[in-house]
Amino acid sequence: MDVKILDARLRDQLPHYATPGAAGLDLRACIDAPITLAPGETRLVPTGMAIHLADPGYAALILPRSGLGHKHGIVLGNLVGLIDSDYQGQLMVSAWNRSEQSFELVPLERLAQLVIVPVVQARFNIVEAFETTARGEGGFGSTGRQ
């Protein structure tokens, strides 16, 4: 799969999988100067990367980095970013400071992660009824807590 890099600043810090079992790779803030996110503020941050998956059997997800969310309250403004296989533009991260403290985002800081996932496009058929299952229409805790 070919991932194109738009920003030459990433040349020395190419995205990579940190371990053999890593599902995601880090996206960095490709900014020229630090950005301060005030409490409650949301800002679009460029990553310097463009992606064109081309294969409709794949999509990419932009997910938050757990450390930024837990330690600093920095999460994604849209919670999850979905990148369709036919998108060709630069990846942008919607950074949301949900904490009560300002947060300074510095150039090339790791801000989010990218995961490439398989996609199945469903067909829909109108039916008179579903086959009966043990669960039936039970939802929201219907199978118990333990």
From Swiss-Prot:
Keyword Metal-binding carried by entry: yes
Pfam families named among the record's database cross-references: dUTPase (PF00692)
Reactions this protein catalyses: dUTP + H2O = dUMP + diphosphate + H(+)
Chain sites annotated for binding substrate: 65-67, 78, 82-84, 92
EC code: 3.6.1.23
KW Membrane (keyword) present: no
Gene3D superfamilies noted in UniProt: 2.70.40.10
Any Gene Ontology biological process: dUTP catabolic process
Keywords for this protein: Hydrolase, Magnesium, Metal-binding, Nucleotide metabolism
Superkingdom field: Bacteria
GO molecular function annotations of the record: dUTP diphosphatase activity; magnesium ion binding
Requisite cofactors: Mg(2+)
Job description of the protein: This enzyme is involved in nucleotide metabolism: it produces dUMP, the immediate precursor of thymidine nucleotides and it decreases the intracellular concentration of dUTP so that uracil cannot be incorporated into DNA.
Stated family: Belongs to the dUTPase family.
HAMAP family registered for this protein in UniProt: dUTPase_bact
Protein name in UniProt: Deoxyuridine 5'-triphosphate nucleotidohydrolase
Record lineage: Bacteria, Pseudomonadati, Pseudomonadota, Betaproteobacteria, Nitrosomonadales
